Amino acid sequence: MKASEEEYRLNFFIKNDFKRKICKSCKTPFWTRDEKKEYCSDIPCTDYYFFDINIKSQPLTVKEAREKFLSFFEKRGHTRISPKPVLARWREDLYLTIASIVDFQPHVTSGLVPPPANPLVVSQPSIRLEDIDNVGITFGRHLTTFEMAAHHAFNYPDHYVYWKEETTAYATEFFTKELGIPEEELNFKESWWEGGGNAGPCLEVTVGGLELATLVFMQYKITDNGNYTPLKLKIVDTGYGVERIAWITQKTPSAFHAIYGNLVYKFFNKIGVAYIDETLLKVASRFAGKIDPDNPDTIKIHRQMVSKELGIDIKAVEEELDRAAKVFQILDHTKTIMLMLADGLVPSNSGEGYLGRLVIRRALKVLRLLKSDVRLYELVKEQIDFWKEDFPQVLKNKDYILDAVELEQQRFEKILEKVPSIASTLARKSEITTEDLIQVYDSNGIPPDLLEEELKKKSVKFELPRNFYALVAKRHQTSTIKSAYDKVKLPKDMLEYITALQPTEKLYYKDQYMRSFEGKVLGVYKNYLILDKTTFYPEGGGQLGDTGLIIDEKSSKRYEVIDTQKVNDVIVHILKEEPSTIKVGDNVRGEINWERRYRLMRHHTVTHVILAAAKKVLGEHVWQAGAEKTPEKGRLDITHHKTLTEEEVKLIENYANSVISDRRPVKPLEMNRMEAEMKYGVSIYEGGVPNSATIRLLEIKDWDIESCGGTHVSNTSEIGAVKIINVERIQDGVIRLEYVAGPALVDYIRETEAKIVEASKIIGSSPDQLTSRLRRILNEIEEKNNLIIQYRRIIETELLNNLKPYEINGNKIYIIEGLGDEEENKEILRKLTSTDNTIAISISDNRLQIATSKNMRVDKIVEELLKGGGKGGGKGTFANVILNSKKSKEEIIEIVRKSL
């Protein structure tokens, strides 16, 4: 959609002598007070000429630019709010915070909940990976991490705050009065914005080739068929570039110098790269507006312009700028890594962890291309020291950040050992596509740049996509949200049946200890029953649905409830049989299986206790990745970058039992969503993100608070005690803890005791002497194993000395019969085939093991053997074959002869 001219013809522009002009280059309309201006002052229509503009503001650091912006709007009636983490954990569809408006999506922007203040101002650290391949090349125009300073106003039908006129006036005042940019240099370029299903006209604020801000007026919803419908809630969504404000006031040769100051020189030094010639850098930066990274020709033209301007050989220019760009990339990436990990990201192969690992590996790849020996964590440590006052969480989580980065580098170095074999596999393809390279990266973590050198050795050429990492990131930056209907275990016809039914009153929230109740039947469909109220808890939040009885008050017939499910706010009781005596309007009595429910309540509550204990022991990066509570045990999946030690598991268990012994109150409370976020942070969403204006929280006094819709005990003492019974790494970056509490712990102890008694009987020992008896048995086994090894060596020596080969066409063929030990066979075959032109075959009934020397292959021998029927195979120099019938030594020799 393109907005009409009237959308942009503001009274503010008319009153302040702004003229609407059409850019001579891009043909886009823009507003300016300079009647002679012919260009929109945005790149690539102009070079970066802000270096030449007389700006009255003193040079501002990023910190000073941020504070100047926030203070300006605070003085003008805006409430300053704290930024959210760079991990968008209040969103189920997005992993990273890509803009300040994300702070308020989807619940504020949809009108579900009010904003935390109105109007408000925030400086939100953001991460976007769509431009990751362009970082450094454009001297700071593209970054993966940046601060979006923003003022927002939310205009409701009954509450107007401000709109286009005031927003444009604020921008003009800030840039001209606060920063001292000459009024004639300020331009407002007409544009259109779309994102997150919303749209609206916008104005891009440009000065001297630099876009400093975008003023979006969100006023349309984009429907599924692509139409635009007006929104009731009209939102002012602005974005000012804090780093660009610092750059334009400092006029440094690149944005990196303005952002990082002396850290730029420190990075060049630590990486071991000579600093770029200052004059070359200034000229290159001035012409950088001409670079369109998606068009490699523009990069070439830019370098030619620099070469011509300075009279320097083009190759020297390219080498200097390429080297500097790589250092700038590492500066940018290490800050992004720092912020991601500080906010709790754990590198992995999925979700947000995948994106974190992608940035880390790209930084490691660049260091490798620069042939630098510096460890990546050393550079991240420099970033922490530099930003610790701006972002206190980076210092708080410093140990975890550095440990995780070093571990990732070690893993990356191990992965690179696979490069030769992966390159060999790729070299066999007739054409290497971008999809092939992405597949190799996703499966093995190997960047294509590092495959390139290996493939060149094999004379294989391929085109490396310039935006490779952006392509990969795009595939992984969002998550699909399941609807309420996708999450339940109910048939489609049942889902359709309940759409017209009223919400069920949740008695289990009024009293979690209520065991029975009376309710009215609202719906009966097959073996599904819906009541007006219930104390049966439906499956959710990892807690199984309740079971129990429904009793027909007329006939006194009892129906067994085998499960309980929920769709939106309607609770469905699943019966073992169809309730033939019950119809709509009847009154029934419900009784939950209390012993089962109470076990679930204990396991659910202790899950919260253990999660907080894990954070205390392992660090704030720990995040719930999944959970399940059954009557028999609880399961909690947490994010963590390495396997837990026995000591860590013991500490988590000790903390949990200490909290149980402390008899801490456990209290559910309801709170406005925004109020809860502002008070407790987004960690309240560890168990999932509820879609409601008011959210239910569970507070364990002075220990944990989290959004949770489950059922819990009212005091930690009711849990009794907890024992962690299993710990395993279920996937990269995720650790699973399994535990038992209360009666389930007693069951576990009894089962363990029974196993000890049984084991004692088997080895002829009493339970209290089990350990010493086992030690004696193990010592005996070890002695016998050593004896077996000695006998094997004697047999092996005897066999090798006496075995005579068959000669076929200059090849030696050894046949071994009757050895039963597979590992012993392999070792003998390996020794027999240590010289060229040798084949060794071990025969045991109809089973064959075949080995060849390195200059031969087993393929053809296997193929010939299987002609007579059988199965098996192998590759290279070893194979296993099972024949349909046993063959003599002579028959085997003849088959081998044919294969040769």
Swiss-Prot record:
A single MF term (Gene Ontology): tRNA binding
Domains: entry comment: Consists of three domains; the N-terminal catalytic domain, the editing domain and the C-terminal C-Ala domain. The editing domain removes incorrectly charged amino acids, while the C-Ala domain, along with tRNA(Ala), serves as a bridge to cooperatively bring together the editing and aminoacylation centers thus stimulating deacylation of misacylated tRNAs.
This protein's UniProt keywords: Aminoacyl-tRNA synthetase, ATP-binding, Cytoplasm, Ligase, Metal-binding, Nucleotide-binding, Protein biosynthesis, RNA-binding, tRNA-binding, Zinc
Enzyme class: ligase
Cofactor requirement: Zn(2+)
NCBIfam families, sorted: A-tRNA_syn_arch, alaS
A biological-process GO annotation: alanyl-tRNA aminoacylation
Protein name listed in UniProt: Alanine--tRNA ligase
GO cellular component terms, A-Z: cytoplasm
